[in-house]
Each structure stands twice: as C-alpha cells, then as structure tokens.
Amino acid sequence: MKEDFKKFKEFIYKKRVGVVGIGVSNIPLINFLIKLGAEVTAFDKKTEEELGEVSSDFKNKGVNLELGDNYLDKLTGFDVVFKTPSMRIDSECLVKVKKEGAYVTSEMEEFVRYCKAKIYGITGSDGKTTTTTIISKILQEEGYKTWVGGNIGTPLFAQIEEIKAEDRVVLELSSFQLMTMNLPMDIAVCTNLAPNHLDMHKDMQEYIDAKKNIFLYQGSTNTLVVNRENEITYGFEAEAKGEVREFSSKREVKEGAYYKDGILYLSGKEVCKKDNIVIKGMHNVENYLAAFIATKDDVSIENMKKVAESFNGVEHRCELVREINGVKYYNDSIASSPNRTLAGLKAFDKKVILIAGGYDKHLLFEPLANEGYPYIKELILLGQTKEKIKDVFKDLEASKGIKINISEVSTLEEAVKKAQDLAKQGDIITLSPACASFDMFPNFMIRGNKFKEIVNEL
C-alpha cells in the first residue's frame, strides 16, 4: 500500500531543506518544495552568471543559493537533503549531514514512495530508454494516461498530485538512482547487465547490487522481468520475492516472451514478425520482448503489434540522419559502452564505417575487436580512448591476422570528413562511440546533435 502524500506535505512544511544540484530534474522539485512551504537552500557548482534567470527567479522566491567551487561546504544544519542521482550516498558531505540527523533522499525515491499509480521500473546496461519508450507507447495505445520519468521524460514528483491510481507510470532508472532505492516497483524490468559506469562505481559488484534494488524490495504481488539470455539478470530469479517473467531471443519460454524463426511470441501466441518491426536489430527484438511480457496484464496483443509496426525509435539510437550520394549516415551516440556498439553494428546487414572513441569509463574494449571486426569496414577513432581502442585492434591483427584499417582524428568534424572520403556508394557510416561523451561533449545527446549538424552540412 502506497503512503498518502498528505503525510509528506505535513512533514515537509517549514522544514529546512537542502537541494543539491540545480539541474533539469531539480528545478521543478525546488519550485514544488517552495509551494509546499519548505525553506529551501539550493546548492550547485555553477555560478550565478552560469545559472542566469534560474538564480534570479529562485532568489525572488526566497531560495538561498550556495554556488561555485566550494558549494557543498555549507551543507549543514538541514532537516532534509535531496541529493542528485550521481551523488554517492557515502560522499563526505552527505555522511556528515546524515550524522547531524538530516533525512537524505532523492526526487525519485519520494516519487516512488507516494505515487498511487502502477509503476513500471526499467533498468539495464543497454536498451533502457528504448524499452521504457516502447512500454509507454504500448500503454498509451491501450488507452492509459501514461507518465514517463526517471532518466527520460519529465521530473514527476512535482506532478504527483495530478497522477491518478488508474494511470500508468513508466520509469527509466539508472544504477545511480537505484543505489539508494529501497521501495517496491509494481513491475521491475532488467533488460540486461554488462560492465558499465565503472568510473563511478567501486567495482562491477557494486554496479550489479545497485541494479538489484529495482526488485529486492518487491512483495509477493509484484513482478520481475528478466532476460533469460543474460547470465547476470537470469541469476536474479533466485532472489525474487514475487512473480518472475522471462523473455528470450534464443529459446522458447513457455509462459514468457520469445523470438523464434522470425516471429515474436507472447505466451505462445504470435505478436508480430521481426521484419515488420520498424526499428531494426536483434537488440530491439529483445527490447520488444521485454515490453510485451512486462505489459501483458494491461495491454492486448493487437496494440502491442500496432506499436511494433509503427514506432520509429528514439533519437540517437541507430537513427538514420541522411543519405548522401548513396551513403547512409547513422547517429548511434547513445552507444556509450562496447556492448552497446556491438548491438548497433549487428543491426546492419553489411560492414560499416565506424566512428568510435570518447571518454574513458574504464571498460574493456577487447569484445569490440574480437566480436565486432566482422561488422567493421573502416574504423575512425577519436577522443580520450582512441589509443586503447587502437591497441585492441592491433592485438587482434597480431594474434589472428585480422586487419581493420584505422584512422585517427582529433575532432568529430574530422571524423565525419574522413568517413565521407572513405565511403563509396552503398556504404553505411555510423557514429557508435562505445564510450561516454564527457571528454568532448557534456552528454551523448549534444554529441549526437553535433554529428547530425555536421552531416546535414555536408
């Protein structure tokens, strides 16, 4: 039984509340807390000038601002602290304020605690956003008012009083958001797990443990959806407290969702043919299977099929940007891990000219070389990791005699120009970096948009 939001309203009134981070999700949160009568102090590394109108607006509303390099020095003396998702709970300033007696939480935790609607929580290393979007589209097609939040969509806590019990909520949840989550999801979906974000987590085990929080607090009436073909998520079944549902791209799963001989099935019934799905690639087949088995109690097979045969995909995910002189340019900027890039490469029916490299998340690139080489015609490298990636392809050449031509460049503009020079009619060029963007761009979306801008100016 979900808690009554009146309880939070009574609790937060007149409380001294610190909000760490004045970003996209926390601006609506801060405004909501003001509306509920809290005394808010907002903390951010940005300066007043960088925040612009946001800072003047908050000051006019009576919000105290602690900004600049040492912005967390004054995180003390609060009743409640809302942290940003990327802020570790064991960071020195949060440990200190917790010892003082502060209640430390996040926008997402409070939303899950008080949301009356059925919640679908989706996590995984790859496919989270696409699966989240597919689930939301399927629910909308069935006629549900559907709210999308977490890593995508809009911050939902500020809208919690508008969300009705008969609505549906779909949340994309990262390992950072889940690290402190101790609340049940009605339906928890784990698309797959592979090494990722090892620059932020102590090790792979901590990353897995964070992801497990999506289902560890469930009860007997809740549901966990796992990928039968992913060793780590399949292993979660032993710890599940509610119903477990499986999906598989490689075997028949009697009561689950599976792919066989070009057809996607749900509980033994055909939903759609693979060739009729608009977004290509086996990774998208898996995303659909996860969505079908997750929503089977809420949605008809007819509406599942309708979405699969009409949904064009999410921006920055194997997105066709343009065709010039018979050469197709794809933006797969979301691919911030080798596994994700491999999935993208396998979506094409021919070898591609691959643009890769970026910020170093301390991931291993051997799989990209050992499994990816049959799909790569030319490799163009840039960014912090270009030498690391080059080394694994050179090792492949030394050990197996398999040579991939490698070009090194300094900028995305140079990469696109080099790809254009190398391409012949009928070729495919894809930006699928296998790395995060932070060495050159603030996020993968800005990287993808820059790529599209460069391609559209050719």
Swiss-Prot record:
E.C. code: 6.3.2.9
Keyword Transmembrane among record annotations: no
UniProt-listed Gene3D superfamilies: Mur ligase, C-terminal domain, Mur-like, catalytic domain, NAD(P)-binding Rossmann-like Domain
Catalyzed reactions per annotation: UDP-N-acetyl-alpha-D-muramoyl-L-alanine + D-glutamate + ATP = UDP-N-acetyl-alpha-D-muramoyl-L-alanyl-D-glutamate + ADP + phosphate + H(+)
A GO BP annotation: peptidoglycan biosynthetic process
Pathway: Cell wall biogenesis; peptidoglycan biosynthesis
MF-aspect GO terms: ATP binding; UDP-N-acetylmuramoylalanine-D-glutamate ligase activity
Family annotation (Pfam families): Mur_ligase_C, Mur_ligase_M
Localization of this protein: Cytoplasm
Binding site for ATP: 124-130
Keywords noted in UniProt: ATP-binding, Cell cycle, Cell division, Cell shape, Cell wall biogenesis/degradation, Cytoplasm, Ligase, Nucleotide-binding, Peptidoglycan synthesis
Annotated Gene Ontology cellular component terms: cytoplasm
Enzyme class label: ligase
Main location: cytoplasm
Tagged with keyword Transcription regulation: no
Family (UniProt): Belongs to the MurCDEF family.
Record NCBIfam families: murD (TIGR01087)
HAMAP family: MurD
Functional description taken from the UniProt entry: Cell wall formation. Catalyzes the addition of glutamate to the nucleotide precursor UDP-N-acetylmuramoyl-L-alanine (UMA).
Annotated protein name in UniProt: UDP-N-acetylmuramoylalanine--D-glutamate ligase
Organism in which the protein naturally occurs: Clostridium botulinum (strain Alaska E43 / Type E3)
